[in-house]
């Protein structure tokens, strides 16, 4: 039985001037997704996708590299201004934000959307190092 030819979808050049940057910074990784106003993903990157492994993924430098990569992809689509939504407790929050600003985006607003429980689930046990 012959395999069907796999079609490669060409990425269309959209002309989007403003969007939303979702920065999800966990203890282990930092993921950045840039979407349009409706929430459709335009560009994404993460520290792991940029080649960092293990504990190096959680560093501010890895977050900066991932944000620069994501910004470059979004600027190819004509994006100029961003709203930034930061989520999570990780160390890459501020450095990713600075990298987006340094890439030439006009940042209109910064929102922290980290979920905070109103005494919900029991938290993890404290680490003893």
UniProtKB/Swiss-Prot annotation:
| Keyword Ribosomal protein included in the entry's annotation | yes
Gene3D superfamilies listed in its UniProt record = Ribosomal protein S11
**What superkingdom does the record give?**
Bacteria
In its UniProt record, a GO molecular function of this protein is:
rRNA binding
GO terms in the biological process aspect are: translation
Q: Name one GO cellular component term.
A: ribonucleoprotein complex
| rRNA-binding in keyword set | yes
Q: Which UniProt keywords apply?
A: Ribonucleoprotein, Ribosomal protein, RNA-binding, rRNA-binding
Matching entries from NCBIfam families are given as:
PRK05309.1, uS11_bact
Similarity annotation: Belongs to the universal ribosomal protein uS11 family.
What does the function comment of this entry state?
Located on the platform of the 30S subunit, it bridges several disparate RNA helices of the 16S rRNA. Forms part of the Shine-Dalgarno cleft in the 70S ribosome.
- PANTHER family for this protein: 40S RIBOSOMAL PROTEIN S14/30S RIBOSOMAL PROTEIN S11
| Protein's recorded name | Small ribosomal subunit protein uS11
